[in-house]
Amino acid sequence: MTEVPWSAVPNGTDAAFLAGLGSLWGNSTIASTAAVSSSFRCALIKTGFQFYYLPAVYILVFIIGFLGNSVAIWMFVFHMKPWSGISVYMFNLALADFLYVLTLPALIFYYFNKTDWIFGDVMCKLQRFIFHVNLYGSILFLTCISAHRYSGVVYPLKSLGRLKKKNAIYVSVLVWLIVVVAISPILFYSGTGIRKNKTVTCYDSTSDEYLRSYFIYSMCTTVAMFCIPLVLILGCYGLIVRALIYKDLDNSPLRRKSIYLVIIVLTVFAVSYIPFHVMKTMNLRARLDFQTPEMCDFNDRVYATYQVTRGLASLNSCVDPILYFLAGDTFRRRLSRATRKASRRSEANLQSKSEEMTLNILSEFKQNGDTSL
């Protein structure tokens, strides 16, 4: 096990208040409590599983996410034209996932290297920035996909004009702008720090110096870019399910794709997004307000659970390609057609090379004067 002190920075306001009460009332207990709370910080115990669990998850996400999203982008660019509105959102979702998985090799090395960051402060900031851009970009694009499907199912005629590709492009540009602006403070809060053992940490949140303001920022982004989209998605899906029950859509492609969409997106939120945001908030609160000797074991458990949810939060990059395959507009059919075409082309090339090789062999025999063939 490795001890990594969070900090020895006092919780200034609370400590000063307690110290003032102790001085005013002459109460040594309160004064000593103030002294403890102003100086004591739990030593964070990093157990061995964190050095193996996270890199194992990230390796899995990198392999599956890289292959799945590469195929998805290839399909959208070369085989899905003309795009529908929902294809625009899915392409942007695949792009966000692909950019994130490209950053994982550095993170994998970081954890195999016992969390000693060797890539510099700028790369650390960029790593954390891209993670959060992917996280909240994915949530917002899933919200757009859900709203798009809701309009198509519940108001199929009224929504014809609103579901055009041009409008989806405008919305996608707006989503990217919102996410980049909202996440840009991460470039300030994140960064590297030197531990007592001279190794370098890459903060996944921030140092204790900026922890309280980061907590406020984190809560604002959680409410605006997670809670509100989740409520909108649940509302859309409730109305979609209601429409599927009351409308005559038995065995229609729209019904099937809508059901797949509901199941996959809710699974992603239940497994990846909800646990991560709950445990991230608890971990920040523990670092801020639960710094007493009797709370250190609790803080260690919170931190360990938070690390588990960090791995789960990255799994959406593996699951999203399943969404394109099952719930996308004609994605599965065109992927099958593209693979068959590529297979036929490969067979034709192989046959052509075989014929060329045979002709070359016959030519060599003739040149050598061998007429036995």
UniProtKB/Swiss-Prot annotation:
Its primary localisation, in coarse terms, equals: membrane
Q: Belongs to which family?
A: Belongs to the G-protein coupled receptor 1 family.
**Topology, Extracellular side:** 1-51, 110-125, 189-214, 285-303
Quote the function comment for this protein.
Receptor for extracellular adenine nucleotides such as ADP. In platelets, binding to ADP leads to mobilization of intracellular calcium ions via activation of phospholipase C, a change in platelet shape, and ultimately platelet aggregation.
Q: Which residues bind ADP?
A: 46, 203-205, 283-287, 303-306, 310
**Bilayer-crossing regions:** 52-74, 88-109, 126-147, 167-188, 215-237, 261-284, 304-325
One MF term in the entry's GO annotations: ATP binding
Q: GO cellular-component terms in the record?
A: apical plasma membrane; basolateral plasma membrane; cell body; cilium; dendrite; glutamatergic synapse; plasma membrane; postsynaptic density
Question: Could you identify this protein by its name?
Answer: P2Y purinoceptor 1
Superkingdom per UniProt: Eukaryota
Q: Name one GO biological process term.
A: positive regulation of monoatomic ion transport
Which residue stretches are annotated as topological domain Cytoplasmic?
75-87, 148-166, 238-260, 326-373
Claim: Metal-binding is one of the keywords in the record: no
User: Where are the glycosylation sites?
Assistant: 11, 27, 113, 197
Q: How does it sit in the membrane?
A: Multi-pass membrane protein
Could you tell me in which tissues this protein is expressed?
Expressed in muscle, heart, liver, kidney, lung, brain, spleen, but not in testis.
Which cystines does this chain contain? 42-296, 124-202
Give the subcellular location. Cell membrane
SUPFAM superfamilies attached to this UniProt entry: Family A G protein-coupled receptor-like (SSF81321)
Instruction: Give the record's keywords alphabetically.
Output: ATP-binding, Cell membrane, Disulfide bond, G-protein coupled receptor, Glycoprotein, Membrane, Nucleotide-binding, Receptor, Transducer, Transmembrane, Transmembrane helix
Q: Which organism is it from?
A: Rattus norvegicus (Rat)
- InterPro entries membership: GPCR_Rhodpsn, GPCR_Rhodpsn_7TM, P2Y1_rcpt
